[in-house]
Regions:
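Canonical Radical SAM [4Fe-4S] cluster-binding loop centered on the CxxxCxxC motif
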Residues: 2-34, 197
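Conserved non-cysteine loop/helix-boundary elements of the Radical SAM core domain that shape
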Residues: 24-222
Length: 222
């Protein structure tokens, strides 16, 4: 039986981050119900035979911005329609400030076994600069909730080369997250995408870019 992975895009969020160029619609709660109804119809239209699902990734946007009932419904349909491996990795992206202990518990009961938490930095000044809705302290609360409800597989996203970010601030963020001992850390370099709020700010010289750049090889300060 051939293996297959599934990605489900949930294009809603509370606020679009300044660097984001993904398809996302901030504060459009009135569209969520119709979107999930259309999504469920599309999933139901697929007829996939002799394929075993080994991974499911629910991304966005901010999937955790939506009421957990939609994610529970989605997971129920995926299980009904497809042959999902017993040990399949099933991930949902969550952002601090959009989840509660109850919502995370709903995810776990629905069969989600991995969280990808968008942190980006442990420096509150930088978080505000790039338009994140949360603080480092809110992330710590979310991380604690995740552990409390029993999530054992947690990824934490961090970003480097943020505007005005220093090497020392990056190292501090890395050390802070490493000390929490998540299963995985994803470290992404900022890309100034065209027509994003951050790209406009830099172009208009309202925001300074980092004074440092990573080399392709031998990054001595990490």
């Amino acid at each position: 039986m051939n293996k297959l992975g599934i990605y489900v895009h949930i294009p809603f969020c509370r606020k679009k981050c300044n660097y984001c160029d993904f398809i996302s619609f901030p504060c459009k709660e009135h569209l969520i119900d119709n979107y999930f109804s259309a999504l469920e119809k599309e999933i139901d239209s697929f007829n996939i035979e002799n394929k075993e699902i080994f991974t499911i990734y629910i991304g966005g946007g901010t999937p955790s911005f939506c009421d957990s009932k939609y994610i529970v419904r989605l997971m129920s349909l995926l299980k009904y329609k497809f042959s999902i491996k017993e040990d399949a990795e099933i991930t949902i992206e969550v952002n601090p400030g959009t989840v509660s202990e109850e919502k995370l518990l709903d995810y776990k009961k629905a069969g989600i076994n991995r969280l990808s938490i968008g942190l980006q930095s442990t420096n509150n000044r930088l978080l505000k600069l790039i338009g994140r809705i949360h603080t480092y302290e809110a992330f710590l609360e979310t991380f604690e909730y995740a552990k409390k409800v029993g999530f054992e597989n947690i990824n934490v996203d961090l970003m480097l080369a943020l505007p005005t970010q220093t090497k020392e601030e990056l190292i501090e963020s890395l050390n802070n997250v490493i000390n929490l001992k998540p299963n995985h850390i994803s470290l992404y370099s900022l890309i100034l995408e065209e027509n994003t709020e951050l790209e406009k700010q830099v172009k208009n010289r309202n925001t300074r870019t980092s004074k440092w750049r990573l080399r392709k090889k031998n990054v001595p300060f990490i």
